[in-house]
Amino acid sequence: MNSVQLKDVGLDLAELIADISRKTFQETFGPVNTEADMQLFLQKQFTTDKLIKEVGIPGNRHVLAYVDGIPAGYLFLKYHAHALLLNDPALEISRIYCLEKFQGKGVGKSLMLEAIMDANRKQLKWVWLGVWKENAKAISFYRSFGFNTFGTTDFLLGNDWQEDWLMARKC
């Protein structure tokens, strides 16, 4: 039986968060981007030092998902508004990552429901996120939770500028 458990994490697990970040990003985007762009991005964005700083910022929340006791993915939440959402109180899902071998086991669903419940507990008006417009699997997943596109933003992967969609749902 696959049982998903969620646990808030702090600085002590920043290295594990960095490892999961690098692995899931490579699994998801490596096949459709150049090796040079991927390496440049991974070396800048998912260092242990950077993740330690990120985890230590008040108001950020990292939630680790375990399947049968094994780390399977994580959620990174930021509590701030977006101008295109009228600057209403909001929660940004900055990352929702699941290792490939655990996809289809309820990890993503558990993490998404935790984000939505957190926003509701805090009486926020929106949950929003950015997603690469070419990531059809993720877009379909987000739509299944009621997310709709409300704008676009540029995203630099290595030396390659890409367009991300901004998606949101009301709480």
Residue ranges, per PLM feature:
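Conserved phosphate-binding and hydrolysis motifs of nucleotide-dependent enzymes
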Residues: 69, 73, 106-108, 146
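Conserved acetyl-CoA-binding loop-helix of GNAT-fold acetyltransferases
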Residues: 104-117, 140-144
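K/E-rich alpha-helical interaction surfaces of small helical-bundle regulatory domains
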Residues: 24-28, 140, 148
